[in-house]
Amino acid sequence: MSDPQTSMAATAAVSPSDYLQPAASTTQDSQPSPLALLAATCSKIGPPAVEAAVTPPAPPQPTPRKLVPIKPAPLPLSPGKNSFGILSSKGNILQIQGSQLSASYPGGQLVFAIQNPTMINKGTRSNANIQYQAVPQIQASNSQTIQVQPNLTNQIQIIPGTNQAIITPSPSSHKPVPIKPAPIQKSSTTTTPVQSGANVVKLTGGGGNVTLTLPVNNLVNASDTGAPTQLLTESPPTPLSKTNKKARKKSLPASQPPVAVAEQVETVLIETTADNIIQAGNNLLIVQSPGGGQPAVVQQVQVVPPKAEQQQVVQIPQQALRVVQAASATLPTVPQKPSQNFQIQAAEPTPTQVYIRTPSGEVQTVLVQDSPPATAAATSNTTCSSPASRAPHLSGTSKKHSAAILRKERPLPKIAPAGSIISLNAAQLAAAAQAMQTININGVQVQGVPVTITNTGGQQQLTVQNVSGNNLTISGLSPTQIQLQMEQALAGETQPGEKRRRMACTCPNCKDGEKRSGEQGKKKHVCHIPDCGKTFRKTSLLRAHVRLHTGERPFVCNWFFCGKRFTRSDELQRHARTHTGDKRFECAQCQKRFMRSDHLTKHYKTHLVTKNL
């Protein structure tokens, strides 16, 4: 396609050895190209004369011919301004009148439909490295431009001056694919009948959040009021907005009779599938047991009646909801949450007998007995495994113990195991007769431990006996040692104005205070444990020896992951060298080092044996 004012270049081929001369398609004759003139000039110039005598005669050259420019026939112009002329490769002229353009194409646009576009590639020079690529544009009805990569072997694009893409794709490419919209999820309605025997409401929906809408008047027993089948509507959860919060409570249409109970509708959001609903007055306890080893969760939903100004009364009967069967027979421990409230009933009280010995020598017996909680409505925000607080009741031989019923519990200080003695003042001794004692030993609570309280001159002592509770055994003193300590405490009573002397040793030889000046070199500290009779020169050695009888090991290794206990401090120091690798004992002959002195002594004997040999 060409305008009459535009020139088209045509190339004529005469022979393989001839030159190519372009010819213009206009009505006037065009001049030869500079390439043709240069070729003709070079052919006319002969070889130099000097070289002609030396060189052999050249072969006969073909006589050059002057190429005549090939001029196409002039295009006859029509009177119309929109006429187009097309020159084909065979020299034929195709002329299209402007009237055809104006009649068929209002915008002056011309579209050529080429039936066989593969004819373009059937030229004489098939190996030419020329490639054309066109990316058409499809203008949609909603003013959106779509870029399409065409297949160059099956389609041709012609773009007029209006920049609108007209494309003729092949039937095998660019097939339209219909896009279907996503299906709209419809709310499913499930009808669950209410059992007449036990008021059980079950949710048949799947996993996820399920919104359960129950009118209040349908929660009563079906056998009593003859209520119809309850309709449960399941709907997908939606985020709470201002309109949703106001729609939590809505009334029924006005066509129904104005019943105050039926107009109030409560919406309960349940997050699991296995639900246990427990009715407790106006509180709904929902026990969720998801299973799979996960702990159950208790949620409390409280039905709040409307304000007095709305003149609506909400009443839920006591038999409205009962316990729904759980997914498993035994529920796991309910974790603690701030909003969870549940009641704990105390077990039957077990009396505990406590003996108190007064300074006058009388022994009083006090029975410590647990009592149930003061108020039945009291709730505890703790887990089910934790013990509840209990108020003690006491009954004793004296009248002053009867006034201790209303007093609060006063726990005693922690008592160390293995017969350690803890000093108590008068206030703590009075509290011991007023409350049940709870002793914490290594994080384990032992209740109802029988104790023996002895009285000295202004100083009270508490000694732990051998007792077993909650699979915990407290290793205390033997009955002989306990009796001996009681005798020592009674014998140590002094007058108020007398000065007491500190006694480092309580063995029989040191207790009487007799000084044996003539036997200073002898061992005077005797072990008072029966059938032992060992004597020691120092009280520290005697105390360390007594720990062997009692089993007490107060020295603990604080090294990581060790925790070994020892009776004596030197044993602990010797053990610590195994961790640090300290070898302080060195052999004087071979400079070999050892951790313990006895090992060095044993090693030194090897040198003596070698020397004697």
Swiss-Prot record:
GO cellular component: chromatin; nucleoplasm
Record's compositionally biased regions (Low complexity): 372-389
Keyword set includes DNA-binding: yes
Principal subcellular localisation of the protein: nucleus
SUPFAM superfamilies in UniProt: beta-beta-alpha zinc fingers
Zn finger intervals (C2H2-type): 525-549, 555-579, 585-607
GO molecular function terms listed in the Swiss-Prot or TrEMBL record: DNA-binding transcription factor activity, RNA polymerase II-specific; DNA-binding transcription repressor activity, RNA polymerase II-specific; histone deacetylase binding; RNA polymerase II cis-regulatory region sequence-specific DNA binding; sequence-specific double-stranded DNA binding; zinc ion binding
Cellular localisation: Nucleus
Annotated motif 9aaTAD, positions: 361-369
Domain of life (superkingdom): Eukaryota
Modification Phosphoserine occurs at: S78
Region (Disordered): 1-32, 225-258, 372-404
Biased composition (Polar residues): 23-32, 225-235
A biological-process GO annotation: regulation of transcription by RNA polymerase II
Pfam family, one: zf-C2H2
Alphabetical list of InterPro entries matching this protein: Znf_C2H2_sf (IPR036236), Znf_C2H2_type (IPR013087)
Free-text comment about domains: The 9aaTAD motif is a transactivation domain present in a large number of yeast and animal transcription factors. In SP2, the motif is inactive.
Family from the record: Belongs to the Sp1 C2H2-type zinc-finger protein family.
Protein purpose: Binds to GC box promoters elements and selectively activates mRNA synthesis from genes that contain functional recognition sites.
Protein name as catalogued: Transcription factor Sp2
Organism: Homo sapiens
